[in-house]
């Protein structure tokens, strides 16, 4: 490197360092100002903090994996809202915060726990030393939003190393916009899109001394329900990750996010189905099917395979119900959360696998699922779960891809295999719901309606070809036209069917 290039590199490096120092100083000033009153209200920056805390703290703790007897590192521990709770069952808790008065207050409240220790330290400091592979759970609540993008990326690299294989990282952040009502002269907080955090943590990995590679696997990402319930606010989002060996299989979620429901694909589907929708007929079929549910204000609805949230917003806004939307695709839920901004409706979203997720018995009034269960191999087990989760008198409504009785053609069999679908004929599908315990089961073949919807959607895409090409390109246009024509052909031939199913508990 010549002298001028070396000098330029040094200037650039100094500029980066100066920017990082400026960031740390701004954050420190901000928290020194907001830590004068060492109260829950000051820490949560909200006048309703005491009431919110009663619901929010148990909810956050309920999302954590078992940490009984384990080592817990709490970053940005504050005055200890969570420190004492963690110390009750953990083997050891190290609580850390970069404001000395705050961590001292935490110690004065929680110092009687002999398994807790307290440290005043900045998580971004290179002087902070934590042994690799020594921690079972890293916990933070409102920390990363006070770090720059570069600081978040660096911290993730370090956290993956600190964590044991099989250990977990849980964090919760304010995304998109401010939540608390405290007045702030200056606000250096970074209100990011959730997908920033998802991307940075997905890219986090470590290689140990033996050359074994490990990475982070997303277990869940969801809104904090207490904020949805009390503030109609979906911007409080938490994530739970697990450190796994890089060879461990997570193929289905990867298939959904990298193949079938990659970001460009979702935007294409939304263009075809209408804003907020990625399933057959968009708002039109949603209105028709939701009307069959006789929803009442205050009821609770579970949407399995919620996609990007259009049906959930429709139900919440038009029927005043509380909707929980779950989807295995991280990309889908990211879009749903973005669509929720400013809507002020009671809808919460979560990245979750409906085959492993559990809810208490008798939780929901309605379980709703649109063109999703075709991905599920063990439908009888899922329907038994639906039956348990529903309140007595509750309803399930499902639309789904089906097939005609008999052996499928080679082409249709190849399509089913490529997509990983599990398809049944309409009658068998209805029988599975009956076998799970549902009464008054309606199992309707709606293939004629499916064909009309497909024809209308295809005609609309072809009519607006120039706009579509400008926004997406020829390859995406060809994929949609080819895909819709193939569905029309399979359905016209009677092989692919579309079913509507309703059952009552």
UniProtKB/Swiss-Prot annotation:
Catalysed reactions, as listed in the record: phosphoethanolamine + S-adenosyl-L-methionine = N-methylethanolamine phosphate + S-adenosyl-L-homocysteine + H(+); N-methylethanolamine phosphate + S-adenosyl-L-methionine = N,N-dimethylethanolamine phosphate + S-adenosyl-L-homocysteine + H(+); N,N-dimethylethanolamine phosphate + S-adenosyl-L-methionine = phosphocholine + S-adenosyl-L-homocysteine + H(+)
Domain of life, per lineage: Eukaryota
The UniProt record lists the keyword Transferase: yes
Chain residues that bind phosphocholine: 174, 179-180, 184, 191, 269, 401, 415, 419, 421, 487
UniProt-listed InterPro entries: Methyltranfer_dom, Methyltransf_25, Phosphoethanolamine_N-MeTrfase, SAM-dependent_MTases_sf
Protein function: Involved in phosphocholine biosynthesis. Catalyzes the N-methylation of phosphoethanolamine, phosphomonomethylethanolamine and phosphodimethylethanolamine, the three methylation steps required to convert phosphoethanolamine to phosphocholine (PC).
Family: Belongs to the class I-like SAM-binding methyltransferase superfamily. PEAMT family.
Annotated protein name in UniProt: Phosphoethanolamine N-methyltransferase
Native organism taxonomy: Eukaryota, Viridiplantae, Streptophyta, Embryophyta, Tracheophyta
Gene: PEAMT2
